[in-house]
Amino acid sequence: MNRDVVLFIFLALVCLSCGGGTKPKKSEPAPAVPTVSPNRDLRPIIVTFGDSLTAGQGVDPNMNYPAKLQGKLDAAGYHYRVVNAGVSGETSSQGLDRVQTVGVLHPAVVIVEFGANDGLRGLPAEATRQNLAAIVSRLQSAGAKVVIAGMQIPPNYGPQYTIGFRKIFPEVAKKFNASLIPFFLDGVGGRPELNQEDGIHPTAEGYDIVVENVWKVLEPLLR
C-alpha cells in the first residue's frame, strides 16, 4: 500500500480505538456455532470463518462477502453452500477456541480470516502465528481444504511488528500447503468510498471487490 493509504487506515484505526466517529449501522452477528438448515441440503459446505470482516459488520446480511460469494458460486454453476461463521471482534485466539464448531460441519473448504484484531491491538505476532497454525492444522485434520486470508496493518506499532505481522500469513500457508489470498482487502483498504464511516469495514460495494479477491484463490480449488 502507498503512504496515503497507510495513513488513512492508521487514522481510521486510531479513531475507532478511541471511540470517535459515527458508528456504522448494526447488523446481526453470525452465530458462534454455525447452524445447518434442516432442509437436508446436501451440497458440500464452504465455511467463511473469521471476525467482523467475515460477519459483515454494518452491512445488510445479504450484502456481506459470504452472501455475495454464495451468489457468485451459484452463477458460476458450482453447487456449494456457504456458511458464515464470522463473529465480530474476535482475535485468532478466540477463533481457535471455536474451531471445533466449524470442523463438525465437515466442510469441503474453509476460508480462514483472522488476525486483523490481533494486529489492531498489538498482540504478539508469534501468538497470532501459533493460533493461525493451530486453526489450519485442525481444519485440515477434519478433511477441509483451507484458504488463508492474508492481512496487513498500519505501521503504528513500528516497522518490525508490521513486517513480521504481514509475514505470518504466507509462512503459515507455506508450512501447511494451504492456499493464500495475499491481502484480503486488496483494492478496498484505504479507499473511503468502499468503506463504512469507521474506515475499516467494507461497504456492500467494497465486498464486491473482496469477493473477487477470494474467488481468484477459491475457484481453482472447486474445479
Language-model-detected regions and their locations in the chain:
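Bacterial signal peptide processing site
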Residues: G19-T22
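Alpha-helical cap/lid subdomain in secreted, periplasmic
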Residues: G71, Y78, Q94-R223
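Bacterial N-terminal signal peptides that target proteins for export
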Residues: M1-V6
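Hydrophobic helical h-region of N-terminal Sec-dependent signal peptides
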Residues: L7-A12
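Intrinsically disordered, low-complexity, compositionally biased regions/tails
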Residues: P24-K25, V210
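C-terminal motif of bacterial Sec signal peptides marking the signal peptidase cleavage site
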Residues: V14-S17
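Serine-esterase "nucleophile elbow" of acetyl-processing enzymes
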Residues: K26-S88, Q94, R98-H106
